[in-house]
Amino acid sequence: MPLNLLKTYNSLLELDSFSESERNISLGRIFHRDFIETDNFFRNKAVKPTPQEGKTTIEILFHHLTTHSEGKYHHRVYDRDRSMRIHWIKFHLQEKKADTIEVFSVKDKQAVRTYIYNEKESYIVVLEPKTPQYYYLITAFYIKGRNRYKIEKKRNRKLEGIY
């Protein structure tokens, strides 16, 4: 399990041989290192977990970054592709390979969202600017299926600046 802590971008975490409990411990260690032990920033703005009334924001963020919504009632289930790339989020927030990512903002139905899009790796980090000082980390995921077309539509509607 500790070997996953040594993984860097763009390697994938090794999770398939773990039981659910072992997998959660391994992912939890990486999450703790990347989101609890250190503060995150994107372009000099703090990146915070999205609050949800009555719940611990860090636990919600961990659950959201390792699961996806499924079915009519949007029940969340383990997402192997998201989980194997959880350590990619910090790398993208830091824009370590700026030449491989595109950053753009789009006005969606609810709010303006800022996207950090890595087309080569089919990966995206979604932020919501809340104030001039910070963003909420909405989600991050491996893009597959119809999501690729959704992202392309968003790119075509991108705003002039980055919010």
Which residues make up each language-model segment?
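Ribonuclease/tRNase effector modules and their secretory precursors
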Residues: 1-163
